[in-house]
Design a protein with these regions (language model features):
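Histidine/acidic-residue-rich catalytic or RNA/ligand-binding cores of hydrolases
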Residues: 44-48, 116, 170-171, 209-215, ...
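Metal-associated gating/positioning segment near the N- to mid-region
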Residues: 27-94, 112-119, 183, 215
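Histidine/acidic residue-rich metal-binding segments in metalloenzymes
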Residues: 144-241, 250, 255-260, 269-289
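C-terminal cap of metal-dependent C-N hydrolases
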Residues: 330, 348-390
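Active-site mouth loops of central-metabolism enzymes
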Residues: 48-61, 126-147, 198-200
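Divalent metal-dependent hydrolysis catalytic cores, especially in the metallo-beta-lactamase
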Residues: 62-88, 99-108, 157-171, 198, ...
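Histidine-rich, glycine-flanked metal-binding segment
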Residues: 1-30, 49
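His/Asp/Glu-enriched, well-ordered alpha-helical/loop segment
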Residues: 194, 263, 273-362
Length: 390
């Protein structure tokens, strides 16, 4: 590694000896991992209304710790589809906080009465939140969608996030229903493309998946009701699935006891088996997959705590991926989710970003080793060592 770039990767015996200044003996070395769906919200309970109730200064303080936890778990890059990530990235890049590379989308774009419209609050409050550059932006009509998209670009968004279907944590909508009209989705994608940004589409229902693909969205987040026809459409469009099986499992297992609203629990419990079946279809059909968790809460004793990202790999293997292919979703496939904003990263190869981790055991033989941050013994981000044994 030379500064932030890998200058050689291969057998140690063939390494250019005049360039070696330090050596480390580790069992396994691999690229730093990507979580392509995590929200820096700074809340301790997975409830959209909780974000409204939490002072922004408290949220901001919490996510600094969340970023550190992600890096210590071996995740050197986070793609954040809605939250405070655009601001956190600035602080990390200034060297004032320790964390991964953060590629934020700014606010989530939602139609009125959509997934990211917090239905239990007055609509004026939701619009006020957008005006204060909060984590959601409700917009309607082509003009409104253009303004919302440009607002995120003004904040420095690396991509755009849109809700193309209903969701779980939103109180009154149906996850199966399409959200935004086709022309609204096309306007958002077209405006993002003018700025070399891709669009990530939150989609549970098939109508939203197909509409998002037809509009040109690069990634489908969740894909709960994906079937063979939708999988074929994803392949034809060269789109990427970010399945987030982790959050489904965590909500079903721990949601009620960790304060997730009853309406959300009813939705996720009804969808859980379908979500796994959709992931299996995607794997069988050969859809490109990038790892994402939908991690969003601060603190270890919460429903989806930062630092537990590696658990998603077990879910991918259980759904049918070979361990090496699962690892690829967290490494080489991660940058695919950012289009032309992606760095040359995710591989141990000359010229790639020097994001590297060492692991106590070969994850190809035991994928669960990556679920425990303690098994990640070393972390280099852009060539700088951030973690090593004491």
């Amino acid at each position: 590694m030379d500064d932030s770039t890998i200058t050689y990767a291969g057998p140690a015996a063939k390494a250019p000896s005049d360039r070696v200044t330090e050596t480390y003996e580790v069992p396994v070395v691999m690229p730093g991992m990507w979580d392509c769906h995590g929200h820096f919200l700074g809340v301790t309970r997975l409830d959209l209304a909780e974000v409204m109730r939490t002072p922004i200064a408290v949220s901001a303080a919490r996510i600094v710790g969340d970023a550190y936890a992600a890096l210590m778990a071996g995740f050197t890059s986070i793609r954040e589809p809605g939250g405070l990530g655009v601001y956190l990235a600035r602080v990390i890049n200034e060297g004032l906080a320790v964390g991964p590379h953060v590629y934020g989308a700014g606010a989530i774009l939602s139609q009125t009465a959509g997934h990211a419209d917090i239905h239990e609050y007055p609509l004026k409050w939701i619009h006020d939140l957008a005006e204060q550059e909060g984590f959601i932006h409700v917009c309607d009509g082509i003009d409104g969608c253009l303004v919302a998209t440009r607002t995120q670009l003004r904040l420095g968004a690396a991509f755009i996030k849109v809700c193309a279907s209903g969701g779980v944590l939103s109180q009154l909508d149906d996850p199966i229903h399409q959200q935004f009209r086709d022309d609204e989705l096309e306007a958002i994608v077209g405006e993002a493309e003018r700025f070399d940004r891709v669009v990530a589409a939150h989609c549970h229902g098939k109508p939203g998946i197909i509409a998002a693909l037809n509009a040109g969205c690069r990634t489908i987040e969740h894909g709960t009701y994906l079937d063979e026809e939708a999988a074929d459409a994803m392949i034809a469009k060269n789109a990427v699935l970010v399945p987030t099986r982790y959050i489904v499992d965590r909500l079903v297992g721990f949601g009620r006891e960790r304060g997730v609203p009853d309406y959300a629990m009813r939705k996720i419990e009804a969808m859980a088996d379908q979500h796994k079946a959709a992931l299996q279809i995607a794997i069988e059909k050969g859809v490109t997959i990038a790892l994402g968790t939908d991690i969003a809460t601060s603190g270890e004793d919460t429903v989806a705590p930062w630092g537990t990202h590696g658990s998603e790999l077990r879910h991918l293997v259980d759904a049918g991926l070979e361990p090496l292919a699962a690892i690829q979703t967290a490494t080489a496939n991660g940058p695919l989710s950012l289009g032309r904003q992606a760095p040359q990263a995710g591989r141990l190869a000359e010229g790639f970003v020097a994001d590297v981790i060492a692991v106590a055991e070969d994850p190809v033989g035991n994928i669960d080793v990556l679920a425990e941050p303690k098994n990640v013994t070393h972390v280099w981000k852009s060539g700088m060592l951030y973690k090593q044994p004491a």
